[in-house]
Amino acid sequence: MDDEIPPFSLVGRHVQDYIQQVAGESKVDPTLIENILPCTPWQARLLTTATEQHEGTLRAVLELGEDVGWSRFYAAWSKVVQAASILRTRIIKHDKYGVFQVIMKEDAAWKFSEATAKESDNQPVEGSFGQPLSTYAIVTDGDSRKFLWTMDRAMFDPHMIRRLTTMLSEAYHERAFAGLKGFDCFLKNLQDRDEAKYKAFWTMNLEGSNAFSFPTSPGPPEPTIVSRYESPWSLLPLVSPKLDSSNLVHASLAVVLGRYFGEGDIVFGALSSQRDTSLPDADMIMGPAMTEFPIRIQVVQDQPVASLLEAVALESLTRRPFEHTDVSEISNLNEDTQRGSTYQTLMLLHEAENCFQDDRSIGTWIDETAMMFGAHPLVLQCFLVDGRVKVVANYDQNVLRSREAEALAEALILVMRQIIEAEPSKKVKEIDCLTPSELERVWTWNAALPAPIESCVHTLIEQQSSRQPTALAVCAWDGNLTYGELESLSNRLAHYLARLDVGQGTVVPLLFEKSMWVQVAILAVLKVGCAFVLLDPSGTAGRRKHQLERVGGRIVLTSERYSDLALGAHHFAVAVGSHSASSWNALPVQGLTCPSPSSIAYVIFTSGSTGEPKGISVPHRSVSSSSKYHGIRAGVSPSSRVLQFASYTFDASVFEIITTLVFGGCVCVPSDQERLGDISRLITSMDVNVAFLVPSVSRVLEPSEVPSLKTLIIGGEPSTRTDLQRWAHLPTLINGYGPTECTVFSNMHNVDLSIWNHSTIGKAVGSSSWVVSQVDHTKLAQIGAIGELLIEGPILSHGYLRDPEKTSASFIQDPPWLLQGGCGYPGRRGKLYKTGDLVRYNDDGTLCFVRRKDEQVKIRGQRMELGEVEHYVRECVQGVVQAASEILLPAWENAKPVLAAFVTTIKSLNEEAKNLATYRISAMGLGIEESRKLAENLPEYMVPTVYFTISRMPITASGKIDRKKLRDLGAEFLTQQAIEQKNTKGLIQERSMGVTEQQIQQAWSRVLNIDSAFIGLDDNFFRLGGDSISTMSLVAELRKLKIHISIDDIFNQPTLRDLAGSVTAIAPHDEGRTGGSKKDEMSPQAFALSPMQELFFRLQTDPNICFDQCYLLGLEQRVSFEDVDRAFQTIIGRHAVLRTRFNRGMDGKWEQRIATSVSESYVFNSVTVSGDRECAQMISQARGKLNIMSGPLFAALLIEGTEEQRLFICIHHAVMDMVSWRILLRELEQLLLDGQLTVPPGMSFQEWCSLQDKHISESFAPVQAADDEKPKVPRGWELAPDVDGILRIESFVVDQRVSSKIMGMSNDALQTKPIELMLAALTSSFNLAFPDFQHPRIFVESHGREAWDNNIDVSRTVGWFTTLFPIQVYPGSSLLETISQTKDYLRGLPRRGWSYFASKFVTEQEKAAFVSKFPVDVTFNYVGMFQQLERTDSLFKTLSLPENCRPVSLPQSKRLGLFELEVSLEDGCIKVALLYPESANTKKEVELWMGNFKEAFAEIAHTLASV
């Protein structure tokens, strides 16, 4: 039967090595070796990882019948042994070849014993490496005889055992065996498989696996204590023939485990002996075809059960050909498969009661295989036989309690029944997993609901005042109050409020620092029938404004310190303090009419996911009930001195103040300074004996330094075992839990470290605690399963203030399980709060906190919605596409939780498109403005501590952000960063920046619109995208910070490190040189033109010709006409040059003067248009209104369209340049968003022109203008008279990859700047396209703001500063030579061409000679990138002008060059646009030129990369 596969052929060429190893280890004759075979991966894993010799050994007992003859039975079994070579197999372990199996030519080894069956069963197994692994014994015990068969677990599977016991029957009755197949057939099939396909399948199957392991080990590994639970057989409903048994079991287990995990990505192990159906007669293979592999099932709770079964069936069908890849092989493929292979639960399916084939004529088999399945913490065996089901659970008691194992087995059967009977529309979340026995226990814990305390809060406190009027009620830094004094003062203030018409039911805000007067104010508000809301006076104005608007009312009680705090037009402050008390000191001391216990006592605001805080309204009944119940549990009494440490916006302050007063204790109130100082000294000095602290605060205290403290309640955020061990000596140590919606505490747990789990929050206080399914609150969760905590009882708040929608979503009424009751407990009606916290029941009914269901978390005791944090990160941080925030816990000792923000940006997403295999994460810095905006919108504790850019957001299988992956990535990054900083001194130095360096880094970030995290000390400003125009913006930014840096400094020291070294502070006497005086601005006298203006007026003699610059801007948020108009008035009043009037003097020369009227210097209208044609017409008319002689020089339109609002601005070019546009738009945006400008104006253009004119006349000696001969124009270049008429446009875009090199790394080789590479590309490509044109006149435009005195600052000045200079570079023999020449020429120009241009305007003769050169052949203008319009948070976005919006006169404007090139940087790509006269007969050459120009960029990027 084994002839098809030659012996020894499966172990390769080294057969003799194998044989020698066998002979030496087994001490057998080599001739007795029948065959040597490799082991299956499953066998190899078991044989090399077994921890005990007996583990998994088959121990089968056959009770022989009285009539069975021994010799006949012996012969029959011997025949079986000879036919089934697996029974003659030994295992050899070779140092080089690993484990392999050897088939021996030998008979069965028998033993005979007179021991009892029990004694024999406990005998050690003899099998080991090199020894027989299948042994047999006849045991006699009195008159009974038993056949005992032991076999190593790696040598059998259930199918093979059934086949072998069938063969015993056939041999005993002398029937021929059916055609058997040797195990080598199966092994040969495994060897021949396509490994790549197997690896590819499992890699894909487990990609992104992030499943939690169940059951979860509670701590370090301990010796396994295996227990067994076996459910009774029970009937199942009739199963459809279409429903495969394995799919039913696997789907059911996935549902059950999904409820335990609280996750939809479920992975568990399966052990199968599935024969490969591609092999003929696979059922006859005699060998262990066992394999263990992971099964991954996505459980979507909202999907129909039928869909789940279809998905499981499809997964099973797809997986089946690849199941014989053992879990050990799968685990080693990658990280995902490794995670997917670390499951703790193993499932086996049996479709027979046991794996033996009984033959009553021989005897009865007793199954002894319970220990055969390995060391998983939970092994489930499901038996499906003849419509009946039984589940056997083998579990480790160190990991899983007996009740949990039993409940899980019963739940599996319960779910199977529901799946079988499910209607087509039934959803997975509707499946009930709670068994009747568990339901009874849950009701036992929650049957008795505490009675409400029907009393107002202040009534309970008044009772204490009556009992002990002289006892201290408040001991504060600013004074003490007895209960009698507190009662008297609060009553008088209540009467005062009543006289101010503060009506009952009003919510009265309180704005106080820590003070004894807070207690007075609280009680006064309650006594007048109102509710109080404590606000944080140090919080942001925006948040306070929202809260005041939310609660309504007019009166705000403040401390005398905050009585002048801005509250808005609809609120006014009433000060409460020692001085203001005289206003109400004479009022009655008797109380007022008590409101109903159902009326609101206080409102408290918590974080909201939409960016707006939620106000929670809490009635008197809830406060009284909660205070009474949790006060008793905490042991609060008249002798209690309770520290009032919590912020007033944290509901723990309610416990500290109200609960203390309700029980007659003393509220100990430190000052805000003391509270943030030495807390230990504070507690001791105030003799505090009761305190509530969040774990992070408790860690700063030394227990030995607070001997007065007797009771400590820790809560607000999860604590660690270490946190509590430090305080274990206290008489009372409590772990407290409670959502704000449930009035401070809903659960408390007296800590017992000997039995305590650090996440235990105890049992309910004043309430009942229910745990429901995470996705369906109409289903109770199993005991031990992760579910959402619901709280029922008198401590619940009313809900959210004036927000019924949110209230109904979080507070539910009468869930079906509450109405139904259960197991003898009657149902009831009730209101419950859905906490959003995931918990699970411990076995004793206490609760264990797991995590938040949504993104709401706590840090430093304060609750927040991560969604709110993410909302404002997106709003305030520029460039953010996606944002996610998480709490990180780095892996170093004593690490504190860190609030982190993860963002993707356009840049990171573009980079990620090239690499989808990994997540790249890096630290990110915020700009000063971004930090300011976050601080304005979020409380301090909600502002992230660390920011990361991530290449792409990790996604779970269900398509949601994988927050666990984010936490892992962030914590790993922080941990690794800490290690690097600790171990690498050089890195620490690299990362450490001084204050000046950090300021410059932030300025670079704002100007270049890139994250500061990407800017290092040795980064080059120009490599990061800087250009001559952005240097002006940088100078202006640094001036705001009182940092003096000139443009020359930036060009000469372009790295951050070097630039910081050149910094000098702005001297006080130099401030005047950076901003013009009012006198200069308003001077009506005419002043000189700038050189560029002079060139323009000499070329353009007709003043009526339109020569403007304009922008059409999209508005990201709507603005009013009035707001824009006010902004324009401010800007035109601020920049006098925009009020310029030009006129021609008697001598024919043009001059300029400043008009005083702002309103007559601009025209602004609002128009509504229906389409582009109408829009173009309106724009054309606006442009036509510009008049350089009478004004205005500024025109604008607010364009209202059907879908968006647009703003058009045009300004005459004679007073405007590209740097000026940046200044103007930045100021316009600030005015529209903030309503004011925070930076003073720069030097006036008038003063600049005067100073420049003086400097030119003094510094440049008149020279005879060179009568330059114009170059000979090639044939075909002769131009018609309308050279300044209709234009053609040619353009191209350089791809981002090449552009990024031109702007960055390509400059490293020759230390060039991007503009130098651009001009080299221009000159070389022009020469190729026009070989007959020798030495074209190419002029470069520059921003011209080159001050000869470093104290002159025109970085914030609007005007026309442009300069022109020629570039005289003749293409060399190579591209590198051309680049080198270009660089040398440009670097040799004094002041980047300004000196050349200025020198041409010294004398009339010089001016005339220079003007005669125009139009030149080519002008080149690099305008750079408009960073402020590319920010994602910019108010403006640039739009294209509609066609046909040019004024009629525009084609008549004079041009500076025949070919005008403009180069810009948009969205990371270099864009080149060429304008030239339509009359030029050069279209073919121009197209060739543009093609060469574009190729030159690519060639430069490639060439310089290899230098």
Swiss-Prot record:
Residues 991-1067 form the Carrier domain. Its EC number is 6.3.2.-. CDD domains: A_NRPS_SidN3_like. GO terms for molecular function: ligase activity; phosphopantetheine binding. SUPFAM superfamilies: Acetyl-CoA synthetase-like, ACP-like, CoA-dependent acyltransferases. Residues 34-438 are annotated as: Condensation 1. Residues 1087-1503 are annotated as: Condensation 2. It comes from the Eukaryota. Pathway: Mycotoxin biosynthesis. Residues 462-860 are annotated as: Adenylation 1. Pfam families: AMP-binding (PF00501), Condensation (PF00668), PP-binding (PF00550). Keywords: Ligase, Phosphopantetheine, Phosphoprotein, Repeat. The modification O-(pantetheine 4'-phosphoryl)serine is found at residue 1028. Nonribosomal peptide synthetase; part of the gene clusters that mediate the biosynthesis of the host-selective toxins (HSTs) ACT-toxins responsible for brown spot of tangerine disease by the tangerine pathotype which affects tangerines and mandarins. ACT-toxins consist of three moieties, 9,10-epoxy-8-hydroxy-9-methyl-decatrienoic acid (EDA), valine and a polyketide. ACT-toxin I is toxic to both citrus and pear; toxin II the 5''-deoxy derivative of ACT-toxin I, is highly toxic to pear and slightly toxic to citrus. Gene clusters encoding host-selective toxins (HSTs) are localized on conditionally dispensable chromosomes (CDCs), also called supernumerary chromosomes, where they are present in multiple copies. The CDCs are not essential for saprophytic growth but controls host-selective pathogenicity. Although conventional disruption of ACTT2 could not be accomplished due to the high number of the copies identified in the genome, the high sequence identity among these copies of ACTT2 is likely an advantage for RNA silencing, because it allows knockdown of all copies of this gene simultaneously. Belongs to the NRP synthetase family. NRP synthetases are composed of discrete domains (adenylation (A), thiolation (T) or peptidyl carrier protein (PCP) and condensation (C) domains) which when grouped together are referred to as a single module. Each module is responsible for the recognition (via the A domain) and incorporation of a single amino acid into the growing peptide product. Thus, an NRP synthetase is generally composed of one or more modules and can terminate in a thioesterase domain (TE) that releases the newly synthesized peptide from the enzyme. This is Nonribosomal peptide synthetase ACTTS4. It comes from Alternaria alternata.
